């Protein structure tokens, strides 16, 4: 049995006061095995981002427990939670959030500096090498394409060698070809032993995952293993009550992989 990288137990996240309370998450229990790629999907307001933020320690649940490996996040102080995020978790968002005055190398080194560690150039260049941008180390964001900037953001997330990488629509601002390149990098990182959890609206992006979780009204209502873009889109269409067609560009199929068995 593959050990869980992340576990949620009866996690609830409520907003507002009694009488006008809204549940962003409603009694969610979930296990995400190590070295797997999980996509999270659902309509707007379904709880996707809330699930990601609570799982990554960016938001505190109203109830329940969240574990990263053997560490329970819900009981940690803000200081310890910040230290854990900086050392054991990586983040990639739709917005690249690179500092325009810094080079790619300097942007990638930022998490190490924030953690109070002196960046080793070899470690920073290794992260850039992983995303194929070592030769662009001295370029500033304005000198890079959108896809290259997102790859720098990915290298920045990887430089601390995190246990789990979280992505919130990481390809949402990219064209389909560039987005497939970033998704291929995420897939290769999972194949190398990392754990990736990604929120997306895109069936093609979700097809790179091992498992897709579908949320509605703060609950996990379905899941799909070894997904294809067509199967994901069909599931979304049933949820929306509409018929959608997948217009995946040529060559958009995810790389072949063994089908994971539910566990």
Regions found by a protein language model. Name each.
Residues 102-110:
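Short coil-to-helix segment of the ABC ATPase nucleotide-binding domain corresponding to the Q-loop/switch region
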Residues 165-168:
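Catalytic Walker B motif of ABC-type/P-loop ATPase nucleotide-binding domains
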Residues 19-22, 73-90, 114, 191, ...:
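ABC ATPase NBD coupling module
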Residues 176-178:
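Helix N-cap at the start of a conserved alpha-helix in ABC-type nucleotide-binding domains
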Residues 140-150:
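Conserved ABC ATPase signature
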Residues 161:
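Conserved catalytic motifs of ABC-family nucleotide-binding domains
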Residues 64-72:
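Conserved ABC transporter NBD signature motif
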């Amino acid at each position: 049995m593959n050990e869980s990288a992340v576990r949620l137990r009866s996690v609830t996240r409520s907003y507002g006061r009694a009488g006008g309370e809204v549940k962003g998450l409603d009694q969610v229990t979930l296990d995400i095995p190590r070295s797997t790629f999980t996509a999270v999907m659902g309509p707007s307001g379904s709880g996707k981002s809330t699930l990601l933020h609570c799982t990554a320690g960016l938001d505190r649940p109203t109830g329940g427990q969240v574990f990263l490996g053997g560490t329970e996040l819900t009981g940690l102080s803000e200081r310890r939670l910040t230290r854990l995020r900086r050392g054991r978790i990586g983040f990639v968002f739709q917005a690249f959030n690179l500092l325009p005055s810094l080079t790619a190398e300097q942007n990638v080194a930022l998490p190490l500096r924030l953690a109070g560690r002196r960046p080793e150039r070899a470690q920073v260049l290794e992260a850039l090498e992983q995303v194929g941008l070592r030769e662009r180390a001295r370029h500033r964001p304005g000198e890079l394409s959108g896809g290259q900037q997102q790859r720098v953001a990915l290298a920045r997330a990887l430089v601390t060698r995190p246990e789990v990488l979280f992505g919130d629509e990481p390809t949402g601002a990219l064209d389909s070809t560039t987005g497939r390149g970033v998704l291929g990098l995420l897939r290769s990182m999972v194949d190398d032993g990392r754990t990736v959890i990604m929120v997306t609206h895109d069936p093609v992006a979700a097809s790179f995952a091992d498992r897709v979780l579908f949320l509605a009204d703060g609950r996990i209502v379905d899941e799909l293993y070894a997904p294809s873009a067509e199967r994901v889109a069909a599931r979304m269409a049933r949820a929306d009550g509409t018929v959608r067609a997948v217009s995946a560009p040529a060559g958009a199929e995810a790389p072949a992989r063994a089908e994971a068995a539910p566990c």
